[in-house]
């Protein structure tokens, strides 16, 4: 993920940034402008419609391990570390990059992949990264065109249609998994219907618009 904050002339941009997760984790700084968050997913999460004493179960050494890195680039100004946050004060633009790895495959390579991610994230070029992203999704997005008679309601429906296509494409990039009920956009620990792959109909429905 690449985020660009643009500052207006004669204005300073002030912000603080951190990484958080509902999953058990630990975080630390790396380089001068980076934060790394590492954790391990639970082995079981009860669906939200189940009532139980321990809905989220962890087991040491089990569950998918993950690491998320965040790195800040500025051209001048001040970036400093305090507690678990990065504080930024600059009159110039700010670029924030977020990247992650897991041990979903090749568990033995997790730590080397994590270290490579921490190194590579420090050298991302925003415009190059933006172009790479646009090239990937446009290859699928531009395969179809929908034209409907203009009315305010139709315009909203058209925007929602294309927005849903964009989200679906970005959560199904080559080398990743197909979307489940919420795809990579799920932010719940106990998601509706457990954010499952319900392949009797819902997984197929995700791709009807494709």
Report the location of each language-model feature.
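Aromatic-residue-lined binding/catalytic grooves and analogous aromatic/hydrophobic interfacial grooves
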Residues: 1-210
